[in-house]
Structure formats: C-alpha cells, structure tokens
Amino acid sequence: MPKTTKNPADYILPLYMNGLAGRMLRIAPPKNNQREVLFIYGHHASLERYFGVADLMSRYGGLSVPDLPGFGGMDPFYKIGEKPTLDNFADYLASFIKLRYKNKRFVVAGYSLGVVIITRMLQKYPELTKKVDMVISIGGFSHRSDFSFSRQRYWIYRLGLAFFSYRLPAALYKHIVLRPMYIRYIYRHMFNAQQKFKGKSGGELKRTIEMEVDLWRSNDPRTYMATGHMMITLDLPSLGHVGLPIYHAGVVGDHYFHNIKVEQHLRQIYADFHYGKIKSLTHAPSIVATAEDAAMFLPKEFIRVMKKLG
C-alpha cells in the first residue's frame, strides 16, 4: 500500500486559549462516523512531528490535536505570568475539552507526556470522566521510578533540568547551544539523539535531523526543561484515582522506561488496565509522518475496542 501524502498544513487551524496563541490540528470524521478523538502529543513535539498518529486516529473519528503551551510554537505559560506546572497543563486541557466538546463524548489518547497530562486532568476534574469513552496511552507513564536510567544519569538529568529551567540559563541554552549547526553536527552524537536516530541512514537520517532542528527551534527551551524536571520527579499515583480503564501500548525494549513498573503504577491509578505491545526501535521516533508510519503505535486490539464504541 502506498503511503499517504497528506499535508499537515491543510488541517491546521489557529488556537487561542487562556491568553495564549497556538495551533490546532483538526481532521473531520469519516463519513457516517460521529465519534470524536482527542490526541495529546508528548515532550519535545509539534503537530507536524506526530501528524501520522493523528492521521491514523482520524480513521476512527473526528480528530483534534491542540498544541501545548510552550511546544509546537505555542506561547509558553511564562507569557501570562504562569509556570508550566502539571496542574496548569491539566487546567489548560480541561478548558479545551469544555470548549471543544461541550455535550459530546470522546476518546482521549496521549503519547508519553501527553498521558501524564491526561491522567492529571482526569484526577483533577473527575466530572469529565463521564464524557470519556476510552483512554489510550502510547508509551505513557505516571511515576519517576518508571524511568530506566541509571542512578547517576537520573541525577545528572534531574539537576541539569532544574538548572536550565531558570530564565537566564534557559536563555543562554537557547541562544548559544540551540544553534542549527550544533544540532546538526553535535547533538546527533549525544545519548538521547543516538536512540532517536538508531537504524536511520541517508535521506531518512537527514529528514530526522532537520525535524530535530525545527523542534528545538520552535519549542520553548525553558518549558522543555521545566516539564522534563516535572516528569523526572513525577508521582501521579499519590494524586488520586481515575474511574476509567486505560488501554496502554508499551514499547518493547523501551530505552526510557521499565514497562513492568509503568504497568504497576498505571494500575494504581486507573480502574482497569489493558496492555498492547509496540515493536519499535525507539520510545518516540523524531518523525511519524504518515498513518502507515504510525500503525505500529496503535495495537489492533485497541482498534477493535474503538470500533465497538457507540
């Protein structure tokens, strides 16, 4: 089957929320299908990076993907005098849902950090669970001990992220380190980048590197660092229960997370847990451009459940 050649720009609309300007991806539902699907992307992301996942999910309902403050080129919380805390992201998502869906029901899916934000939103706004038909986690997590880093690497990340989340260090990082030349020729050899670029060569490697350049230049570095620190100190199980089942797709051999610990912690939060496998070389590829590229991230058993929804 040939890959689709849809252009993300054809589906992107302006988004203005709580004094912040960003974008939203909207794909109309298939014919005779009134189901709605909300997708929340992960850390270090944009609408373009995960367009393939959005395109795939749009086969099962009308698809909406809002930018997150500080990511994808959207204004950061700092612009309105707020910080990118998990509760602020949860409040933002709840506001979007109330405005977008009103009396409609919907499926909500998240990728990595997106699952964290969805979970906190459902904990904080339990009344919204009545509108949710299904919660899907793709490479999601809920607790700091889910990370598989060595103790030394964990503390390097934790202290480094905390330091660069301050205004001056973040500004220096943006204007000195995040230059396109650095990203193209030095960043590609670092630990995290090597995981993303594994198995890529030639034109595919070049496209992946250019996507990384776009991501680092469009995302707010201070927000990136602050949310990274939030993730690496996370403890969602202590913040409440969610009275819904979660359908979690875990990456086999994920270089970031212990899948068993991820399951244990999600079971503590959600009413039930259903597991599906993702066979991927990395936790999150730099580009998921088409529905065909994204097919491995949505297990067939999850698709069957979605198709049975009213």
Residues of each region from the PLM?
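Conserved HGGG/HGGXW glycine-rich cap/lid loop of the alpha/beta-hydrolase fold
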Residues: 23-76
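Catalytic active-site module of serine/aspartate enzymes centered on a nucleophile-bearing elbow/loop
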Residues: 269-310
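Gly/Ala-rich beta-loop-alpha elbow adjacent to hydrolase catalytic centers
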Residues: 110-118
